Swiss-Prot record:
It comes from the Bacteria. PROSITE patterns: COMPLEX1_ND1_2 (PS00668). Keywords: Cell inner membrane, Cell membrane, Membrane, NAD, Quinone, Translocase, Transmembrane, Transmembrane helix, Ubiquinone. NDH-1 is composed of 14 different subunits. Subunits NuoA, H, J, K, L, M, N constitute the membrane sector of the complex. GO terms for biological process: aerobic respiration. This is NADH-quinone oxidoreductase subunit H 1. NDH-1 shuttles electrons from NADH, via FMN and iron-sulfur (Fe-S) centers, to quinones in the respiratory chain. The immediate electron acceptor for the enzyme in this species is believed to be ubiquinone. Couples the redox reaction to proton translocation (for every two electrons transferred, four hydrogen ions are translocated across the cytoplasmic membrane), and thus conserves the redox energy in a proton gradient. This subunit may bind ubiquinone. It comes from Solibacter usitatus (strain Ellin6076). Its main location: membrane. Belongs to the complex I subunit 1 family.
Amino acid sequence: MELLDSFIFISLVKAAVIFGVLMTTLAYLQWVERKVIAHIQVRPGPYRVGPHGLLQPLADVIKLITKEDLVPPYVNKPLYLAAPFLAITMALLSISVIPFGPVIHIGPVTTAMQMTDLNIGVLFILAVSSMGVYGIALAGWASNNKYSLIGGLRSSAQMISYELPMSLAIAAPLLISNTLSLRELVERQAGSILNWNLLSGPFPQVISFIIFIIAAFAETNRVPFDLPEAENELVAGFHTEYSSMKFASFFMAEYANMITVSAMATLLFLGGWMAPWPAAYGSSLVPSILFGISGLVLLYHGVNAVRKRDKLTFPAFGIIFLGIAGIFLLPMVQSWLLPLFWFCAKTGAILFAFMWIRGTLPRFRYDQLMGFTWKFLFPVAMLNLLVTGFLVAWTTK
């Protein structure tokens, strides 16, 4: 019992669980993105490795691990090797303070559903995520390649420029909530969707939310802000000279940053793990209904499938989904499983937006990219913060 109650043991267990789930999520985010873009372009996407391509991430990992790890002779080797490590470390470190749910009680153990609960969690994420640009800048410089250098410089300028409107967009809901703790920030949005920072307060933060999402796309170097990796201009940008797992580290860092900014948007504006309406009106039944319907649909397609493999895989996944629907009805797990569902659903919706935008929009020119933030986004973010601050001060006198 003393071991279970020990802070070190609980922290190690949480770290192992979060790391394992995160690595699996990073691997499958690429599969989901390829599927989403494929369906946008009316093609099947990954389909051969495993049922419906579900084992494609495993095949990609094996391929990257077994590929030859080339180090060009003309690079600055210490900085060249440090760059991908720095990028992925900063990306993973920022996730360590994100709360996935409320404080939970498991037997004698009481713990928060996050790696560590900092009272300055928002500030920590801003500081750590900003350091990720050093990894990209070092990669561009150490590669001793003109395309890599231009990509690194573009990324540095872009991330620094869009950090300002993002910080101003974050400051507005913080003024309303009056806290830098991510857990407390979510707890102050409890009740219903009308209490979320997006819609509540003296000045609903719709503008802040839009600015934050736009800046998040730029911060993560995603379309339409992927100028540092513009293939038609820079070959592959800052990671042109990288191969094997060092190459994969930059992609893992990109997807980890996507998860971080999506989770931040959920926590700051969308009520975190809070349901959109109270449990008395049936919010606790939503996961069971969704998984139950999905399971029945999969069973139906399995019965009517043409291919032999589909006759096995569809019913198997249908039974799994029906089992998950039943688990959500168990009172003993609802206290932590329902909040986790709502948090993942909101974060997943924003991640889907990242993929949707990639499949539909072209990239900006570099002058348009920089002009947009300094001439439009930054002034609007500043004006929004001033109006929010004035109204908060006026209503709390």
